């Protein structure tokens, strides 16, 4: 009995200490409203039992408790917001530069230390060093790749004419992967067997599945669970395949010595990373990790932007007709044509369509950060160091205070110049914003517009799927519960 009483006393003391050490977290909850959820689990149980309806969970709580609220995921508090004013404070604050460890650890375990997952202290210099790889002249040098791969995609879609509705999301993502890989490590990758037979694409898809699982169900990141579940083996095989392909290209470039006195040519991420490696600013492993990270960040997001734009235009043929008329003026003859940068600048309505697509179906629906130090909101509320804080991009883009009484409607006129000027600058944030925005956002818009221009000049798309039946699944990248099929009709 004495032993039991001693253990009980120790347990009570430990519990009191545990609660006391977290007192600032509990006090924060008095100032930021939100649900407590179940003991230990918080609201995590809802993510487990409502897998295909997860996008509605955060929205539900923000509708109840306000545009900024606090939720508990297990024993961990997380502040979420759809308020553009609060989003601006977060994005511009040096205290919120770190990505949440819930996100960064799974990414790092697959791709290594890259811009996607680096902690702020390392990210600042790395971002500054890699910015030249995304300057305008470099992006323009990608146009031949964009045109060539878009031609291949259009030819494939044309082969589907007369076959009824087809599921083409995976085929469009494959196109996106091909351009992401070539613009990251160079066109020599097309000679690699693993690139040609899509095995390296499958490896990247394995990365994405494991990252998503680890983020949504953090306990799966545990090494023991991951090993018993076979995920460590899958991850190791995928990393081996990707590292072999990228490593071969890195080795080849390192063997090519730059001419004495010549300026290094910056035409891709890998070339800039190799230059930094030669200057002693990046290790060889970091070069490889950065290349891997860029492909992970680019291929599904860009592919989904194109796919989502196509399904929305198929659902709203009046807007598709307007796009077609704009493209027909630019390219009177259908078939294969080269799209220039000047052509892209003239696609005014198509750009509005792409922006509206990214508003309604953002490629990344949620941006998680973690406070480096105590962070004070303009309201006076202090969010302690180490607390997760995130912007719900999906909900921000449908905030009635900024998008009107029917924010879920598809209306490209939301992006007419007058409407953009009158709106809060952080009401539309598909590529994040502020200090740690997406380095490749111009790349994403350019490649998406070019591919869409070729597809929509050559094909009319239709679908029997209704807009109101779209269901959105909360994920790292936006996911549809059902991917609508598309039917293609040849234009002349």
UniProtKB/Swiss-Prot annotation:
Cofactor(s) this protein cannot do without: heme
Keywords associated with the record: Endoplasmic reticulum, Heme, Iron, Membrane, Metal-binding, Microsome, Monooxygenase, Oxidoreductase
PANTHER family listed in its UniProt record: CYTOCHROME P450 4C3-RELATED, CYTOCHROME P450 FAMILY 4
Species of origin: Drosophila melanogaster (Fruit fly)
High-level lineage: Eukaryota, Metazoa, Ecdysozoa, Arthropoda, Hexapoda
Topological relation to the membrane, as annotated: Peripheral membrane protein
Example GO molecular function: iron ion binding
Gene: Cyp313a3
EC class name: oxidoreductase
The protein's name: Probable cytochrome P450 313a3
Record EC number: 1.14.-.-
């Amino acid at each position: 009995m004495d032993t039991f009483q001693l253990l009980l006393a120790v347990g009570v003391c430990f519990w009191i200490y545990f609660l006391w050490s977290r007192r600032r977290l509990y006090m924060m909850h008095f100032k930021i409203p939100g649900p407590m959820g179940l003991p230990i689990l918080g609201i995590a149980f809802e993510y487990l039992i409502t897998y295909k309806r997860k996008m509605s969970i955060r929205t539900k709580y923000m509708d109840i408790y306000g545009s900024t609220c606090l939720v508990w995921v297990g024993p961990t508090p997380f502040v979420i917001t759809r308020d553009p004013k609060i989003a601006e404070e977060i994005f511009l604050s040096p205290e919120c530069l770190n990505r949440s460890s819930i996100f960064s650890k799974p990414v790092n375990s697959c791709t290594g230390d890259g811009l996607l997952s680096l902690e702020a202290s390392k990210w600042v210099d790395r971002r500054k060093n890699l910015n030249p790889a995304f300057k305008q002249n470099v992006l323009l040098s990608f146009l031949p790749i964009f045109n060539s791969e878009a031609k291949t995609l259009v030819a494939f879609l044309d082969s589907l004419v007369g076959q009824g509705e087809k599921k083409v999301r995976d085929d469009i993502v494959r196109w996106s992967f091909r351009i992401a890989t070539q613009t990251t490590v160079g066109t020599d990758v097309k000679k690699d067997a693993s690139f040609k037979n899509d095995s390296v694409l499958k490896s990247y898809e394995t990365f994405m599945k494991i990252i998503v699982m680890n983020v949504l169900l953090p306990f799966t990141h545990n090494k023991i669970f991951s090993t018993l579940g076979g995920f460590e083996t899958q991850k190791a095989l995928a990393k081996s395949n990707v590292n072999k392909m990228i490593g071969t290209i890195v080795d080849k470039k390192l063997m090519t010595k730059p001419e004495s006195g010549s300026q290094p040519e910056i035409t891709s991420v890998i070339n800039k990373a190799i230059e930094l490696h030669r200057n002693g600013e990046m290790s060889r492993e970091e070069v490889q990790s950065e290349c891997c990270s860029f492909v992970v960040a680019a291929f599904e997001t860009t592919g989904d932007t194109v796919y989502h734009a196509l399904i929305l235009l198929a659902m709203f043929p009046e807007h598709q007709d307007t796009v077609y008329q704009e493209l027909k003026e630019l390219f009177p003859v259908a078939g294969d044509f080269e799209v220039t940068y000047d052509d892209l600048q003239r696609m005014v309505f198509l750009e509005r369509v792409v922006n509206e697509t990214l508003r309604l179906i953002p490629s990344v629906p949620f941006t998680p950060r973690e406070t480096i130090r105590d962070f004070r909101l303009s309201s006076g509320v202090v969010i302690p160091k180490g607390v997760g804080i995130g912007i719900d991009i999906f909900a921000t883009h449908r905030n009635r205070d900024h998008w009107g009484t029917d924010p879920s409607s598809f209306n490209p006129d939301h992006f007419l110049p007058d409407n953009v000027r009158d709106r809060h600058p952080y009401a539309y944030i598909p590529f994040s914003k502020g200090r740690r925005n997406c380095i490749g956002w111009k790349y994403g818009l350019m490649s998406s517009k070019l591919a869409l221009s070729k597809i929509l000049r050559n094909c009319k798309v239709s679908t029997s799927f209704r807009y109101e039946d779209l269901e959105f699944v909360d994920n790292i990248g936006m996911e549809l519960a059902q991917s609508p099929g598309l039917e293609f009709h040849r234009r002349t």
